[in-house]
Amino acid sequence: MDLPVRKKLPHTIPQWVAEGSWFFITINCAPPGKNQRCRADTGNAVLDAMKFNHEKFVWHCRLCLLMPDHLHAIIAFPREPGMATIVKNWKKFVAGKHGVSWQRDFFDHRLRDHHELEEKTSYILMNPVRKALCKRPEDWEWVYRPNNRAPPSW
């Protein structure tokens, strides 16, 4: 029996959305449940790749948190080359260089206001606590949170 194939998500930022708007994204590993990220050999490399893209203005990362089999991030993207291309290239680099296997595609949600931004920030930081991986958010080591978290201007 063939399983249904999920539709491919477009990840195109509409023209009416301001460039530099924040997006909540989730990227999952394949297979689910396998700890590919929260280990010294890959966790630091994934966070370093996130930081590299931030520092080179490929994207603007407000927060990235690694979980054993997925990551959550709040990122702003330039209109060109666009979210889909940027994330695809980043996943390809991390997979090729560090052996992380990703699921096809990723989830994104545009954060429409400051309330949503703060809500998703709290959700991300509390994720390892909810999963009983640590007692307090500040105890979780697999986080990239740059000092410059202001919205970008490309």
Question: What is the predicted function of each stretch?
Answer:
Residues 1-154:
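Short catalytic/metal-binding and nucleic-acid-binding patches
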